[in-house]
Amino acid sequence: MSSLTHFDAQGQAHMVDVAAKPATHRVAVATGRIEMQPATLALIESGTAKKGDVLGIARIAGIQAAKKTSDLIPLCHPLALTRVALAFALAEKGNAPQVVCTATVETVGPTGVEMEALTAVQVALLTIYDMCKAVDRGMRITDVHVLEKHGGKSGSYLADPQG
């Protein structure tokens, strides 16, 4: 396992110097889900939530969040993102109606975009919670993780499909 890179020799936090790293195409895909009551999922699916188009607004919130990641996570580098895409799947897994969010983020740069993909997913799911909390305060955000990343010196990572 590699050592932690966000600490200097004295143990002080610092932003990693990426100036000497080559710019390469970087891609990260993250996912997560929000579980809810069947009636809440039906509201989202029908587009009749009081606050409007839940998934449309969650998509925009996720895109904005990816772009603002370095403002939220102190040691993240500001990046020129070349693509941010969010997809939603409505499903009933067992007895848990849910919305699954998947974010794909890309850049050409010296550092990866995993944090941007994770931030996009989290904020999109939080937006769904915010827009539906009046009818379902028991929603649960869960299973947020990186599915895959490509590019850079460390190469590719694919999450174990078994979890």
Curated annotation (Swiss-Prot):
Chain positions recorded as substrate binding sites: L75, C76, H77, M115, E116
UniProt keyword annotation of Glycosyltransferase present: no
Subunit structure: Homohexamer; trimer of dimers.
Keyword Lyase tagged: yes
Biological function: Catalyzes the conversion of (8S)-3',8-cyclo-7,8-dihydroguanosine 5'-triphosphate to cyclic pyranopterin monophosphate (cPMP).
Enzyme Commission (EC) number: 4.6.1.17
Enzyme class: lyase
Family membership: Belongs to the MoaC family.
Family annotation (InterPro entries): MoaC, MoaC_bact/euk, MoaC_sf, MoCo_biosynth_MoaA/MoaC, Mopterin_CF_biosynth-C_dom
BP-aspect Gene Ontology terms: Mo-molybdopterin cofactor biosynthetic process
Catalytic activity: (8S)-3',8-cyclo-7,8-dihydroguanosine 5'-triphosphate = cyclic pyranopterin phosphate + diphosphate
Gene3D superfamilies: Molybdopterin cofactor biosynthesis C (MoaC) domain
Molecular function terms from GO: cyclic pyranopterin monophosphate synthase activity
Active site, UniProt feature: D130
Pathway in which the depicted protein is active: Cofactor biosynthesis; molybdopterin biosynthesis
Gene from which this protein is expressed: moaC
Protein's name in the database: Cyclic pyranopterin monophosphate synthase
Record key words, sorted: Lyase, Molybdenum cofactor biosynthesis
